[in-house]
């Protein structure tokens, strides 16, 4: 018995927007409705998220993954398209739109808004990355247990989604800056 269903049973209108991380991805888990963005995460070849459907209408022929950074990559890059096409913008806009058009007199609203970022890919619009130009981003913390994982990985040679390795402090700081800006 999931919380959205409990609230729905108590008279709420329940809605989820953004990353839900479900499978199958169109199961509502008690929500009256959802608008999904799984940021490229596809477990069902027949599933296309609401964000990607919207993106195809807004930017025909363009690629929402234009940075080339994928789900679970720890590399970083600047979002290459208009920031109004970014998944973070879409999620916020969908939530604001629902709230502004919702009649609170009808029944109480439970709205779950789940932004896919700062999860990878680390692809913020440039203006947000600029906020961290002079930020003091600390070197990665390395514990005593790291010895068994200490194999030196060169970022150009390593898979961008490798679970561990020494990618070098500058690589990690750059990824963190993009994470913060996301």
Please describe what each predicted stretch is.
Residues 1-182:
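Formylglycine-dependent sulfatase
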């Amino acid at each position: 018995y999931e919380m959205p269903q409990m609230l729905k049973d108590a008279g709420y209108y329940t809605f989820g927007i953004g990353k839900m991380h479900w499978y199958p991805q169109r199961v509502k888990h008690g929500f009256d409705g959802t608008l999904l963005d799984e940021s490229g995460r596809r477990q069902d070849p027949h599933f296309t998220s609401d964000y990607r459907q919207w993106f195809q209408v807004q930017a025909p022929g363009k690629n929402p993954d234009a940075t080339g950074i994928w789900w679970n990559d720890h590399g970083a890059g600047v979002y290459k398209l208009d920031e109004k096409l970014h998944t973070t913008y879409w999620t916020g806009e969908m939530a604001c739109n629902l709230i502004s058009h919702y009649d609170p007199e009808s029944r109480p609203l439970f709205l779950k808004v789940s932004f896919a970022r700062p999860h990878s890919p680390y692809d913020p619009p440039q203006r947000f990355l600029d906020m961290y130009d002079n930020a003091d981003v600390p070197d990665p913390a390395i514990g005593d247990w790291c010895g068994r994982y200490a194999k030196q990985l060169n970022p150009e040679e390593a898979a961008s989604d490798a679970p561990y390795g020494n990618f070098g402090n500058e690589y990690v700081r750059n990824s963190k800056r993009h994470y913060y800006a996301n």
